[in-house]
Amino acid sequence: MTMHYGGDYNPEQWPEKTWHDDVRLMREAGVTMVSLGIFAWSRIQPAEGVFDFEWLDTVIDLLHEGGIAVDLATATASPPPWATEAYPQMLPRDENGAVYWPGSRQHFAPASPEYRRLASELVTAIAERYAKHPAVVMWHVNNEYGCHLNYDYSDNAAVAFRAWLAAKYQTVDALNAAWGTDFWSQRYTSFDQVVPPRKAPYSRNPAGELDFKRYTSDTLLDLYLMEKRIIRAAGAMQSVTTNFMGAFPPADYWAWAPHMDVVTDDNYPDPNDPESFRASAFARDLMRSLKPDTPWLLMEQATNALNWRPTNAPKAPGQMAALSMQAVARGADGIMFSSGASRGRAARSSTRRCCRKPAPAPAPGARSSNWGPSSPHCPRSRRAPATPAWPSCSTGRTGGRSATPTTPSCSTTSHSCSAGTPRSTGSTCRSTSYSRPQTSPGTASCSPRSSTC
């Protein structure tokens, strides 16, 4: 089985004149697959009802001509300014009622009807255009659900939370019994009286907080399933996934995993913190265990130093290869990176273009890997285009500019597209893990989890 090697590719952040050079460098580096269009909503849809696919057609065709497969994103993780201007009610709120304004990412209320409608229209347009493109081997839904914005306390969330509670408990009396609402005179007579666990004078009902966290995980999963159904309805037969974040408390990945065709993980251990390497090993074991006998992929890791920790250390010589092989040793079927090129003015960036220098050759007698004769840090040899390790059927495409029809390359099993349902009252939170605080000079003060966003 051939293993995939590559990373996020953001051509919309670069002049078109660099795209050919990008593909050439990828070929020299042995890249076999890139994740494309993750944050490209504003470029794909510059206005409501208006779509511009010409640039994306060009990029996908260039990658295909270069033998590089595409993990095509649905681009729904960051709504464009025109959307939030027209529909400000889609913006999320914190527990104090303050609005999370545009200007970053993940600025959408998961339960917002306006966001869901706009996201559905975007995904429909993308899926219908590229479902049959021979370069597309996988679909990347949204990005890191729950990242940066763990919980939304908006009015949209309040309405959806009440509906979730009504579906779970059926009656208000059952809710009162489960939450122990006679304590502090909290007894409800209607589901409409329930609000999300917003800021209160003192500690809030812990049972209510737990249910709100379960509701949040289920709501985010429902968003994923909504997009997956649209992709399947467009006739796309490739695998569909979204990227997990290790031991991430806001999402119950054990409930999500059955709906993933490929399990993927984003992992950013701190080069200054040995404990984070152990935490990343745990995260990799977690990914392998979520859906046994299913491929899992390290979707994101840093190419070197980051810019979002209190202290941002570069990786020491050998760390890149060691962390990559740590994932391979724990069953990863591919090694990918985030931001293979520096983005200059971007809010988040790695410091250099990946794979500018060849890595040392393996030690004599070392077992050769699927990356070719070089280490996974920066393979030097160009291999034949990879054969995906998961279901992929390419039959040519109906949109775009230079598709070459091909015969179907595989068959795939049916996929479940039914929406999730609230879990029983016996459900428990899983996968909580935190790295220990650091106190030594020059290190990060605290790392909340090994797989940060």
Predicted regions and their residues:
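Aromatic-lined substrate-binding rim segments of carbohydrate-active enzymes
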Residues: H20-E28, T32-Y100, T124-A127, M226-A234, ...
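Polysaccharide-binding and catalytic clefts of secreted carbohydrate-active enzymes
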Residues: N96-V262, D266-S280
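Short, acidic/polar
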Residues: Q13-E28, A119-A125, F244-A257, A316-S324, ...
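The substrate-binding groove and active-site-proximal loops of carbohydrate-active enzymes
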Residues: H4-E16, G37-W55, Y100-S120, N142-N150, ...
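Conserved, mostly hydrophobic/aromatic
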Residues: G7, M26, V34, L63, ...
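Carbohydrate-binding surfaces of carbohydrate-active enzymes
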Residues: F191-V194, G246, A257, D265-C453
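Short, well-ordered coil/turn segments that N-cap beta-strands
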Residues: M1-Y5, G30-T32, H64-V70, K132-V137, ...
